[in-house]
């Protein structure tokens, strides 16, 4: 795929390194940063089966998680319970923001981490990645790894909007270490 797409690997890696580190590679970097850099480069090749894995990190697999799932329908993001039994809030089904960050901004940030495909597939995969809190929560300031982990587990706000788009509601939720999974929907017994 590298040669089919005409990608200059060295240039692609250098560009992604500059996205993370404006002064070039540091002497030491967290493994997650290396995984993110390599994942973005690899996704440019367009191989949907390619992935970067580390014993410390795998994209979309790190705790903590949202205590709900997200889905895309007609260009809107809907929130539903982690067991998929109902919407998170049936009167306010659509997500406006996560932790004060617009949901569309959260989605757009993760598109480069997904291999080339149809716009619908890319969006669906990006929305799915948002179940991992670290995919949308930003940590400002210094601190070590333990400090970042502690901050990742803080409660967060989910702003929802009604079907007609006229009313909003904000829920304060706590991240969970239990990964919600996307299964068959609707459940087979409801067909």
Regions found by a protein language model. Give the residues of each.
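Flexible, low-complexity junctional segments that flank or bridge functional domains
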Residues: 1-191
């Amino acid at each position: 795929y590298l040669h089919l797409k005409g990608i200059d690997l060295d240039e692609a890696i250098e560009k992604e390194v500059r996205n993370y580190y404006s002064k070039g590679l540091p002497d030491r970097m967290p493994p997650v940063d290396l995984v993110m850099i390599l994942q973005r480069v690899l996704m440019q090749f367009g191989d949907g089966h390619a992935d970067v894995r580390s014993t410390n990190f795998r994209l979309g697999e790190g705790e903590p998680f949202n205590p709900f799932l997200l889905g895309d329908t007609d260009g809107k993001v809907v929130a539903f319970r982690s067991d998929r039994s109902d919407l998170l809030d049936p009167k306010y089904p659509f997500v406006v923001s996560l932790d004060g960050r617009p949901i569309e901004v959260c989605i757009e940030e993760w598109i480069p981490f997904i291999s080339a495909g149809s716009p619908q597939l890319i969006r669906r995969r990006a929305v799915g990645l948002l179940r991992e809190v670290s995919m949308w929560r930003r940590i400002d300031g210094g601190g070590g790894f333990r400090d970042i982990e502690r901050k990742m587990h803080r409660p967060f706000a989910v702003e929802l909007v009604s079907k007609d788009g006229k009313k909003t509601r904000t829920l304060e939720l706590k991240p969970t270490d239990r990964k919600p999974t996307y299964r068959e929907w609707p459940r087979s017994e409801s067909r």
